[in-house]
Amino acid sequence: MTLIYLLLALFAERMLSKPDHCHSNFYIDKYIDWLNKKSYLTQSVSTSGLSLMWLLPGLLLVAALTIVNVSIIDFAVTLFVLYMAIGCPELRNTYKCYLQAANQGDIDTCNIYTQQLGLGQLEPRTFGQHLIWLNYQRYAAPMIMFVVFGLFGVVAYGCLRTLHGYSQANNIHVQSSLSKVLHVLDWLPIRITAFGFLLVGHFSNALPKWVGFLFDTSTHAKLVLA
């Protein structure tokens, strides 16, 4: 059933236009706005409090589905959450605009789109690595989280990633604890994703490097994909 969910979600993500209310960030951003209005997200927030914030939405959703216990509702909600979590049309459209600017040789416009994709300035090698990282976050990570932790994992990972970005942007002092949790959660998915790239790339050349990272717990997840 897990495979069916993933295939249906990927098919829907590719075939259907995804409006704002069908993207996970739409709801997570509203959740963060609510936390701000209630003054829960402040500089004095504790590590345990911040942990509860990214765990709570997933726990509540799973609890609600368990209480309702109707198969068709469980199926529809699970599929919709996966559909929202997988992919990012805004990033895809930005990348298409970047390619158009690159084909026209417009370096200044390329730099603008590069910044929108999360990089400071255009560097071909770094840019390619960053695109791989974005695809991991939007596709591989939520799919693997769903396989390992179910619907709770998809929601919790999305909340954790967004709260981590928010805490970095606002210099919340416990952001380091979120970084450590993300590092642990990304450890297995990033190596599975890297192995997938091995199978479609230079397997014999890259395999020794992949094996070297296999039990490495210190290297940042983004560098493993590089």
Explain the meaning of each model-derived region.
Residues 1-226:
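Hydrophobic N-terminal alpha-helices or hydrophobic patches in metabolic proteins across all domains
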